[in-house]
Design a protein with these regions (language model features):
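Short glycine/serine-rich loop/turn segments
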Residues: 70-212, 263-265, 382-401
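An N-terminal boundary/leader segment
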Residues: 1-52, 289-290, 467-475
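Structural helix-boundary/capping segments
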Residues: 33, 112, 162-264, 281-286, ...
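Flexible, acidic loop-helix segments that line cofactor/substrate-binding pockets
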Residues: 39-45, 237-244, 258, 264-266, ...
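Acyltransferase
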Residues: 17-25, 55-58, 272-299, 322-330, ...
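Short, well-ordered beta-strand elements within core beta-sheets of diverse protein domains
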Residues: 8-15, 95-98, 210-217, 344-349, ...
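Conserved hydrophobic/aromatic pocket- or pore-lining residues that grip, position, or stack substrates
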Residues: 27, 50, 72, 78, ...
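Short helix-loop capping/hinge segments that flank enzyme active sites or metal/cofactor-binding pockets
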Residues: 70-90, 252-263, 313-369, 381, ...
């Protein structure tokens, strides 16, 4: 099927040049031919039922009922979120029969926009780690090379996008879970500013490390899905009241007026794989040729203290959400070692350490506010290593530097998370071994629209869609 984007598919359905039934059949055929190898989509719905739902969407359209831009689009939700009628396993055998009776808020909005839910996208066990493997569904393979990992925790979503199994995808992000798999599979991952996409489950006041967000093969699709997912909800007291407008309100910025601060590896603080910074810097240099100003940016911040801040807040957050599984010795023994370690560490969090972490986080935010007085956006790699062996759970060292935790190799993502600012991962290119990488851009708080308009301009100047042809030669 020839189309440029999910937004293009939407227009074709609205104009009746493509039927929902035809799209569903093509999608199911594509999944049949690619998913057995990649393992991106799990918990698939019955095919005949999906085709019937697609026909119902066509019938509704024939009667003048158009539900929204996702009318008839097949969609699979990340397997950490609830959709009615599908198991939310979170990649854990302990939750293999967890059948919710209602949609999560953002999924309800996607359903209301007309999407047809076809299944779930694969994740690491209980969403922890940036490698999408679990004992329930298995490992998701990289879109460009099945010997490599897909990243995570939205690994299934990113691979399904890159492999054209889904028109657009949702994900979530605490420690780069939208950004890392986007980078590893040459797609776009957008972590909205905190509160932009409301969350109504769990701690609605202090649970501000993770957020849902959109992924796409192009920026326009990411914007469209964000507009569906975003918007204030009375059940989410910290959700943004300001509306983002419509798709037509988003215009590419002039790159000649953009000043980017390159954070790189924070002056050799972060260990990075050889060639990774070069890949990102080459893309920034290309931005410079079209008029953007690129400058090295030294924030003069104690990054080691930010890591300790992160550990404390993450331990505390996860203990609150996963403690029931840890308290029961039977279920605790069935959790992967990394999850057991994370929850065990939470027992050592004190009121003093929590207060200190909050102070460091506040100072980090103030540091970025000062930086944004000079720069429009801050840039840094989306990961510290290129995609690695799918059989390896996580990198234990980077260029001779040992990683002391299972997630230390993703430290590059915590600054964006802790700031609460919007962050987008855009394709940065490939290394000499044809492994993809992405580059993160952090925007000021509340400036999600401005960051996405920059991303539109980036995509126009440095398009990446032709790179998907590499998949057929490497998979």
């Amino acid at each position: 099927m020839n189309y440029d984007s999910a937004t293009d598919l939407s227009r074709m359905i609205a104009n009746k040049t493509l039927s929902c039934h035809e799209l569903m059949q093509c999608t199911l055929d594509r999944i049949d031919s690619t998913n057995p190898e990649k393992n991106a989509i799990v918990a698939m719905a019955d095919k005949d039922t999906l085709l019937q739902q697609a026909q119902m969407a066509d019938n509704a359209l024939a009667q003048g009922e158009y539900r929204g831009w996702m009318h008839g689009l097949p969609h699979a939700v990340k397997d950490l979120a609830d959709i009615k009628g599908f198991v939310t396993s979170c990649g854990s055998p302990l939750l293999a029969t967890n059948l919710p009776d209602q949609d999560s808020l953002f999924a309800a909005r996607i359903r209301e926009a007309g999407a047809i839910f076809i299944g779930k996208t694969n994740v690491p066990e209980v969403g922890l780690g940036s490698q999408s493997y679990n004992t329930l569904h298995g490992s998701t393979k990289n879109a460009f090379n099945t010997a490599l990992c897909a990243g995570g925790s939205s690994g299934g979503a990113a691979v399904a996008l890159a492999m054209d199994m889904l028109p657009v995808a949702d994900g979530s992000d605490m420690m780069g879970s939208l950004r890392n798999p986007a980078a590893y599979n040459n797609v776009v991952g957008f972590r909205p500013g905190i509160g932009r996409v409301p969350r109504t489950g769990g701690d609605i006041f202090f649970g501000q490390l993770s957020t849902e967000g959109p992924m796409g093969r192009c920026v326009e699709d990411v914007i469209n899905l964000l507009l569906t997912m975003a918007g204030a909800d009375i059940r989410a007291p910290l959700s943004w009241r300001e509306e983002l407008g419509n798709l037509t309100d988003f215009k590419p910025v002039s790159l000649k007026n953009i000043h980017i601060g390159w954070l790189g590896d924070f002056d050799n603080y972060l260990a990075t794989e050889t060639g990774l910074l070069d890949t990102c810097e080459a893309k920034l240099k290309a931005l410079g040729t079209v008029g953007s100003t690129i400058s090295n940016c030294d924030l003069a911040f104690d990054m080691a203290s930010l890591w300790q801040c992160w550990l404390t807040l993450r331990h505390w957050f996860l203990a609150h959400s996963a403690d029931p599984l840890f308290k029961n010795p039977v279920t605790r023994a069935q959790l992967k070692p990394e999850v057991q370690w994370e929850l065990a560490q939470a027992k050592h969090v004190t009121t003093e350490s929590l207060g200190s972490a909050c102070d460091v986080r506040a100072n980090w935010y103030r540091t970025l506010v000062s930086a944004f007085e000079k720069y429009d956006f801050l840039a840094l790699p989306s990961a510290q290593v290129f995609p690695f062996d799918v059989e390896q759970h996580w990198p234990t060292e980077i260029e001779g530097h040992g990683m002391d935790t299972y997630h230390r190799w993703m430290e590059v993502t915590i600054g964006g998370t802790l700031s609460g600012c919007p962050v987008i991962s855009l394709p940065a290119g490939f290394d000499q071994n044809n492994r993809p990488m992405g580059i993160q851009f952090i925007g000021p708080i509340g400036e999600d629209k401005k960051l996405l308009e920059f991303a539109l301009a980036y995509e126009q100047a440095l398009p990446w869609q032709a790179d998907y042809a590499r998949i057929e030669h490497q998979s």
